[in-house]
Amino acid sequence: MAVIKIKPTSPGQRGTVKISRDHLYKGEAFAGLLEPQFQKAGRNNNGHITTRHKGGGHKHHYRVVDFRRNKDAIPAKVERIEYDPNRTAHIALVCYADGERRYIIAPRNLEVGATIVSGSEAPIRVGNTLPIRNIPVGSTIHCIELKPGAGAQIARSAGTSATLLAREGVYAQVRMRSGEVRKIHIECRATIGEVANEEHSLRQLGKAGVKRWMGIRPTVRGVAMNPIDHPHGGGEGRTGEGRHAVDPWGNLTKGYRTRNNKRTQVMIVSRRKK
């Protein structure tokens, strides 16, 4: 992949940095793995806004990605690497020996024509999926399950990965990209390697319109609103919040932890780095 810096021929082009997609498949996505994706614009069934700053954006289909990788001992050939508008990572279309096709998250250095396989007897090779108990300590992994058979939930975005640190009893210790070390059951599956499109973090959108293409609407500061619209609103001219930072409903937004899942707290060996 290559980084493309756009010439500053206009204010919208100035500072724009794109990621080359020359190595990706140029045709249409595989129709058998597409599903319609309807615009909700952040509204619920009553039409009320439940998530702000959503709406508009380019229409696209959802690509059904296989996060379980549960076709064991059946080799699959990589037919093509594709762009996916629903995620930062690229996806790979693989064809199994029995003729079934599935999309998977494309690992780095996975090439068209390569063969991948899942299962406990799979070799340690990029793109292969195994239970954590069969993966050597120190390996770089991605698409990690939190519950056996539930499908990958960790390290799925572009350029991400985790490191298998140790195994103790029925749990393994995995260090995330954030620095957090977490216990994961050894029967959970993970894929060897790291996710492709690692240069995604170098992308610069260049103009506000690109965010609108992505379906993201503007965010207005509370201090720029009227008092009826936000607790920070009002005042003559430019004024500060006048209080601790809160959201539009008066809830504190800075300086305290919001995680409340105490049930899985024991699975965290060390917290992430700030």
Curated annotation (Swiss-Prot):
Coiled coil: none annotated. GO terms for biological process: cytoplasmic translation. It holds the Pfam family Ribosomal_L2. Residues 229-246 have a biased composition (Basic and acidic residues). The keyword Ribonucleoprotein applies. Signal peptide: none annotated. Residues 224-256 are annotated as: Disordered. GO terms for molecular function: rRNA binding; structural constituent of ribosome; transferase activity. Keywords: Ribonucleoprotein, Ribosomal protein, RNA-binding, rRNA-binding. The keyword Iron-sulfur does not apply. It comes from the Bacteria. One of its GO terms (cellular component) is large ribosomal subunit. SMART domains: Ribosomal_L2, Ribosomal_L2_C. Part of the 50S ribosomal subunit. Forms a bridge to the 30S subunit in the 70S ribosome. Belongs to the universal ribosomal protein uL2 family. One of the primary rRNA binding proteins. Required for association of the 30S and 50S subunits to form the 70S ribosome, for tRNA binding and peptide bond formation. It has been suggested to have peptidyltransferase activity; this is somewhat controversial. Makes several contacts with the 16S rRNA in the 70S ribosome. PANTHER family: LARGE RIBOSOMAL SUBUNIT PROTEIN UL2M, RIBOSOMAL PROTEIN L2. This is Large ribosomal subunit protein uL2.
